[in-house]
Every structure is written in structure tokens, then in C-alpha cells.
Amino acid sequence: MSKKLTFQEIILTLQQFWNDQGCMLMQAYDNEKGAGTMSPYTFLRAIGPEPWNAAYVEPSRRPADGRYGENPNRLYQHHQFQVVMKPSPSNIQELYLESLEKLGINPLEHDIRFVEDNWENPSTGSAGLGWEVWLDGMEITQFTYFQQVGGLATGPVTAEVTYGLERLASYIQEVDSVYDIEWADGVKYGEIFIQPEYEHSKYSFEISDQEILLENFDKFEKEAGRALEEGLVHPAYDYVLKCSHTFNLLDARGAVSVTERAGYIARIRNLARVVAKTFVAERKRLGYPLLDEETRVKLLAEDAE
């Protein structure tokens, strides 16, 4: 590889590439979440009959993975570049390999493997066929064809490509520690993020008030239910995300037992399923506006029978 791209140049390159493939460039969703999949731009849009092609960077928080900024590869918060395409293009894997070439990674010169790794997210009732993508022995991407989201079968099938930006940047820049990644010319990743990593880790493992978090979970769950009673999908889903992050904080603090853990996950999943069903009903009521006219009329006629 000749020029070593900065972290932000990697993002810009991927944005331009997937824009050229017809993806809308969305912005990171403004609620804490553990993965880009949990953004409404993936979770909600992967269900129902309407097409959807989007790409976006998603900061992803995983409190239990915090290491006070001392581990070169484990982070409280990392960044994913998320691509969702529905229906899935038949050449999605070829497009992905082409995107690596744009980053200066020639597939013919490197060991790139698709390793089967079917995906499941119990807290949202989602699952799919999947592969990890390994570049010279390091996982850099997760590929998933969604089969179920929010407890609902998907159709048409949505393809999801999730790049781990820190891992990709570490490889491209040939650095061993994420904190040595060059974010922009002259600015290191650690100069931006190592202090937040330390503080969030300290809060998650030492400072957070378990009683307040438990109360918050109950309140967020209740508010999600109230929003759903009024058919308000998006406010309800915001509270599902808040429940999920609050649970992750409780889990990091060691505040939930194995039995309680399953119960909390089930509570989040039940809410996510109702959100998914309500969203599909809402899109139908709106007349599936993203469908082409012929398909829309046909589908609405079939639904009316």
C-alpha cells in the first residue's frame, strides 16, 4: 500500500464508494447503542417490503468492553461503518471487495476469507446468515443477510456490511494500538478518545448508581409502552435503545445475575417486537411510499384481500 489513509479519509472513501452504489449517506443516530444494526436506519428499515439503501458511521458503545484506555484493542466505544441494502444486490460481496481496493487493499495480494458466523441479537429478536471477513488473519467486517428482525421474517432480504473502522485503520496504517491511529493529519486517535475511554470505563465499572439505573430501565420501558399505545414508533424505539444501553451499564457493573440477565433481555426483545410490528403497520397505512407505483398498488391490493 502506498499512501496510508487517515481514519477520516477511510470514512470519506467508503462514503464516496457506497454513495456511487446508490446508498443514501445517513448520519449517526443520536442515541446510545451497542452496534450500528440497532440504528433505526437498519433495524426498522430492514423490515417491510420497501427498498432501502443506506450507509453511515455509527459510534457504538459497549460498556463491558471498556478498559480505561489501557488496552490497545478493547474499547468502551468504537466506530462502525454500516451499509444496508434492500433488496440485497446479487454482487454485494464483489462490491465489498471493490471497496477494499478503494482503500488500497488489493484482494489479490492479501489473504481475505469469508468465515461463516451466523448472527443473532437476542435483545432485538433479530438473526441472519452471516460471515466474518478476515484480512490477513484479522477480522475487519461482518456480513449478514437478515432473516429476522424484531421477530418478523424479512422480505426482501436485506444485506448488511459492517466495517470495524478501528481495526481497518490499524491494518491500513500498520499500527499495533488503536490510540496510535492517525485520525487526521497530525492528530492521533488517542488524543481525541483516550480520556473519554478512561472516564466512561471508570463510570461504568465503579461510579454508576445501580439503583438509579434499575429505576431508569423501568421508566424507559414504561415510556416505550406508552408511546406504542399511541402508535408512536420512533419515540418508542428511542426508549428501547435507552433500555438496551441501561441494561449494558447494569451488566458492566455486575448488577444483574444470570437469571435476571435473561429477563432483562426478554423485556427489551418484547418491546422491540412490538415496535417492529407497529412500524410495518405504519408503513402500510402510509401506502408504502418508497415502493415504485406498480409494486405499491399491487401490494396494497393484496393486503386488502
Swiss-Prot record:
Transmembrane segments: none annotated. It holds the Pfam family tRNA-synt_2e. It catalyses: tRNA(Gly) + glycine + ATP = glycyl-tRNA(Gly) + AMP + diphosphate. It is found in: Cytoplasm. GO terms for cellular component: cytosol. PROSITE patterns: AA_TRNA_LIGASE_II_GLYAB (PS50861). Belongs to the class-II aminoacyl-tRNA synthetase family. This is Glycine--tRNA ligase alpha subunit. The gene is glyQ.
